[in-house]
């Protein structure tokens, strides 16, 4: 299996993003987005997926964090798709339940080439929840869905994320990111029993 690495740059009038990703890393992560809680989530994602992940993002956070967070998720998804290459020899499917104190979250991944995202189970109040920003740029939990959708669509994977139960918005969000991380780790890992593309169609 060749090196599974990617470097993607994306610049718009709203943000400038650079993501470097190594799927066969050891969890070395360096993230700077200008949104401290999002940095924390990306650190958790890279660490628990055992990816080497470098993210540098500058955006119009003086307006709010939305553009920077969503655009970073887009570029991460693009890097993930590029690093996967021809997808030969991978497990393809990944699944993880992650507890965090009172919260339990679940994520399932299919590296299918058919982008789709289902995000469900967050308490209704999450659409109004703000995490961090005292001081600094706050993270609005309503963007969680946008993050996971952007990753799925740009990596061309099917991603299902659900909250089974939980109360604290920080714990809920972090459990979701960690569940996605562990599911991705399992899905992209080499399978010693598979040499070709893991599909009856012969392509993903």
From Swiss-Prot:
* Pathway info: Amino-acid biosynthesis; L-histidine biosynthesis; L-histidine from 5-phospho-alpha-D-ribose 1-diphosphate: step 6/9
The record's keywords, sorted A to Z, are:
Amino-acid biosynthesis, Cytoplasm, Histidine biosynthesis, Lyase
Which reaction is this enzyme known to catalyze? D-erythro-1-(imidazol-4-yl)glycerol 3-phosphate = 3-(imidazol-4-yl)-2-oxopropyl phosphate + H2O
What are its GO cellular component terms?
cytoplasm
Molecular function (GO) terms for this protein are:
imidazoleglycerol-phosphate dehydratase activity
Q: Does the keyword Amino-acid biosynthesis apply?
A: yes
Keyword Amino-acid biosynthesis tagged: yes
Q: Could you say which protein family the record assigns here? A: Belongs to the imidazoleglycerol-phosphate dehydratase family.
Write the protein's name.
Imidazoleglycerol-phosphate dehydratase
Q: Which organism is it from?
A: Rhodococcus erythropolis (strain PR4 / NBRC 100887)
* Name of encoding gene: hisB
